[in-house]
């Protein structure tokens, strides 16, 4: 069975924990888009591990971790991650494979990203400044440097020289920044080449072989669906397609080979950076939500904006991803709220609407229409049995399923992989729940 697991909001939904939990039964985990601009936090037996590029299956012995062609790969970020994992005794090089068609994220991409955000000032998009957007620009413009280019040093030098000269024009004459030296970039890549050369290969062919052996594969998304470059809250989006269709194009795996699409969603909503957020709470409730949820970016450390669950945006996410199941995370964050609110419609320019507008100026003016439910005000932290959950919490989950039309198959009640209620089996999971 082949399953896509992705975020349904603006990222930070808890994908890493769920992927890690499910990898017990899989042969491979695949990253298919994004870069090191988002982190997946895993907590196993109290020990925290943050992954940025390497798939979340790396903590399971024998699970292949594949970086697909849709990822933009920062060599220094990858090496730092490998070293951190090696220090914990994890044999990364034995499990990790990198698509030869994967584009590399290089120093001029980072320099351009930072220069652009600085120029925009108060109108900045709120990127992480890690070069993701410029790296994807080079890919689309067909001037990108790919992992396979590392295998041909002479050709690589010429490509780096041309690309650096091209980007230095913008850096020096438009943004008034110091130009970069192509030789130093090349030298860094040569050091990187020696370390990862054995891991470069044909990920698409490898996935095909696993499929023919009827092995289980997880395709792990980064960021969230509302940050999709085409279908998200443009221009306040990331630079890649974060929706289910990207799992095929970003890995070289045929779209008809996917069996399920699981969407990870918090029991509330968070967002980092600028952009419209209809249910955002700027009052004490929002501060309480952020504090209880420890809502700070795992990579950037930036505080996340918090708000009530948005049924309207979630329905859009379900539609564009063809979700077959929902994983509800961080339910325990809501434990101390006397009242829970669900946004069931928007009021835009005096009209009640049930679809999120693509017009961002209109979306920014939308106000949430709320349905109020009683809170449970008792701890759900660490529960593993659905029948032990407070009645009000079960009512909240049932109402979500009713409004969304998709079953909530897994509920996360804490950060550890053990803090989980599985209501519907995925692969051959032996953890089951009553109720």
Swiss-Prot record:
Residues that coordinate or bind IMP = 12-15, 37-40, 128, 142, 223, 238, 302
Supply one GO BP term.
Answer: 'de novo' AMP biosynthetic process
Which domain of life does this protein belong to?
Bacteria
List residues binding GTP: 11-17, 39-41, 304, 330-332, 412-414
Cite the binding residues for substrate. 298-304
Localization, UniProt:
Cytoplasm
Report which reactions are catalysed by this protein. IMP + L-aspartate + GTP = N(6)-(1,2-dicarboxyethyl)-AMP + GDP + phosphate + 2 H(+)
Q: Report the top EC class in one word.
A: ligase
* Main subcellular localisation: cytoplasm
Amino-acid positions noted as binding Mg(2+) in the UniProt annotation, renumbered to this chain = 12, 39
Q: Which SMART domains match?
A: Adenylsucc_synt
What CDD domains does the record tag this protein with?
A: AdSS
User: Which pathway is it part of?
Assistant: Purine metabolism; AMP biosynthesis via de novo pathway; AMP from IMP: step 1/2
Q: Name one GO molecular function term.
A: magnesium ion binding
Q: What InterPro entries is this protein classified in?
A: Adenylosuccin_syn_GTP-bd, Adenylosuccin_syn_Lys_AS, Adenylosuccinate_synth_dom1, Adenylosuccinate_synth_dom2, Adenylosuccinate_synth_dom3, Adenylosuccinate_synthetase, P-loop_NTPase
Q: Where is the active site?
A: 12, 40
User: Could you confirm whether the keyword Membrane appears in this record?
Assistant: no
Provide the Gene Ontology terms for cellular component: cytoplasm
Q: What does this protein do?
A: Plays an important role in the de novo pathway of purine nucleotide biosynthesis. Catalyzes the first committed step in the biosynthesis of AMP from IMP.
Q: Hey, which family's this protein in?
A: Belongs to the adenylosuccinate synthetase family.
Q: How does it assemble?
A: Homodimer.
Q: What is the protein name stated in its UniProt record?
A: Adenylosuccinate synthetase
Name the species this protein comes from. Coxiella burnetii (strain RSA 493 / Nine Mile phase I)
